[in-house]
UniProtKB/Swiss-Prot annotation:
Its main location: cytoplasm. This is ATP-dependent Clp protease proteolytic subunit. Signal peptide: none annotated. GO terms for molecular function: ATP-dependent peptidase activity; ATPase binding; serine-type endopeptidase activity. It comes from Lactococcus lactis subsp. cremoris (strain SK11). One of its GO terms (cellular component) is endopeptidase Clp complex. Belongs to the peptidase S14 family.
Amino acid sequence: MGYLVPTVIEQSSRGERAYDIYSRLLKDRIIMLTGPVEDGMANSIIAQLLFLDAQDNTKDIYLYVNTPGGSVSAGLAIVDTMNFIKSDVLTIVMGMAASMGTIIASSGTKGKRFMLPNAEYLIHQPMGGAGQGTQQTDMAIVAEQLLKTRKRLEQILADNSNRSLEQIHKDAERDHWMDAKETLEYGFIDEIMENNSLK
């Protein structure tokens, strides 16, 4: 069963105007990245980033993250857009940033990466497979691509933290969960937010 998206009513000299809550947040340069990372969600996030950057690239964009991760290509499209635009992208992790979510959240502008006290981070190696009935040659191609993807993601994580590539590789061998304090020590975030001190 779906959930109801709240509507916000605003009064102005020209009368009342109704917004869905996400459109209203977008007016304040806030983007909500929630749920699994997949192509449709990534396209929506990218469009919002581009729109806000075109509106005013001197102001921060606030990206709230709560995701179990998902598609590597969709996630990297978001990261590439974050790096492409001129606006600083401030990231706030609430709930969790797992797997591809960790790549996205840690790619916020350095010095502007935050996490709520009870949120969690997860790093691990990328997953994939060739499927049943796949020829051996195709399986080798898939395995080689997975290794390339793993190296690329681990390099991003090393660049976004204060850990070496070797340490990232070791820690990502299996699921590696971190609470907010551990994530701060690891270097993926710059501050744990106890209250809203952003505005």
